[in-house]
Amino acid sequence: MRNKYIQAFEDAQIASKSVPDFRAGDTLRVAIRIHEGDKTRVQNFEGICIARRGSGVGETFIIRKIGANSVGVERIFPIYSDSIEEIVVLRKGRVRRAKLFYLRDLRGKAAKIRELRK
């Protein structure tokens, strides 16, 4: 059983942050606040969400994008991190899995995800 003070703090953290509804297969743009010396800037990371795991304050998601020279780049973000400015859902993907780790082995058009029709 959790300490009631810790539980109250976690509930406040979750309530203070508005997170859009997204799943694995969705294309996201995450705006991350980066501190460099005494300056702060916002950097966008855009890619496909390949997994969500955990629950509550400790919940994380993995985003994969194809960078320069066709090199795959993956980043793991805590959903309720203070360094995340915003999460924007660009496309809803149509997939039948919760974890899309098989995309790591695919290249080119094979790595495309169909868009969810409304």
UniProtKB/Swiss-Prot annotation:
InterPro entries in the cross-refs: Ribosomal_bL19, Ribosomal_bL19_CS, Ribosomal_bL19_sf, Translation_prot_SH3-like_sf
Instruction: Please name the PROSITE patterns in this protein's record.
Output: RIBOSOMAL_L19
Q: Name one GO cellular component term.
A: cytosolic large ribosomal subunit
Q: Which GO terms describe its biological process?
A: translation
Q: Name one GO molecular function term.
A: structural constituent of ribosome
Identify the Pfam families for this entry: Ribosomal_L19
Q: Which UniProt keywords apply?
A: Ribonucleoprotein, Ribosomal protein
Which ranges form a coiled coil? Answer: none
Q: Which residues form the signal peptide?
A: none
UniProt function note: This protein is located at the 30S-50S ribosomal subunit interface and may play a role in the structure and function of the aminoacyl-tRNA binding site.
Q: Which HAMAP family match?
A: Ribosomal_bL19 (MF_00402)
Protein family (similarity comment):
Belongs to the bacterial ribosomal protein bL19 family.
Q: Which PANTHER family match?
A: LARGE RIBOSOMAL SUBUNIT PROTEIN BL19M, RIBOSOMAL PROTEIN L19
Q: What is this protein called?
A: Large ribosomal subunit protein bL19
UniProt lists the gene as: rplS
